């Protein structure tokens, strides 16, 4: 869907929403709470990609979500950009 040298955004393989996009840094970062100071530029680029995608979905039912701890299934930092009512 969208890719830079450091960030990949793709359509979720098992979507929970009509539009369900996942944005990840290509560098392994396990979660939001493990970010280090030298990751700030990467995080800014990731947020820019998320903002670009989210700006395409301006309806009421949209969101940008990240999880940590027990709620984080994939142990790689990622954000879900979603639109519409949940499918399930």
Predicted feature descriptions by range:
Residues 1-88:
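HIT superfamily nucleotide-processing domains
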């Amino acid at each position: 869907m969208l890719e830079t040298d450091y960030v990949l955004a793709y359509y979720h393989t098992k979507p929970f929403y009509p539009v369900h996009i996942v944005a990840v840094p290509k560098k392994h970062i396990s979660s939001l709470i493990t970010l280090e100071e030298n990751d700030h530029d990467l995080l800014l680029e990731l947020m820019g990609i998320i903002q670009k995608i989210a700006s395409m979905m301006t309806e009421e039912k949209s969101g940008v979500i990240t999880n940590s701890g027990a709620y984080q299934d994939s142990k790689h930092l990622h954000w879900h950009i979603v639109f519409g009512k949940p499918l399930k």
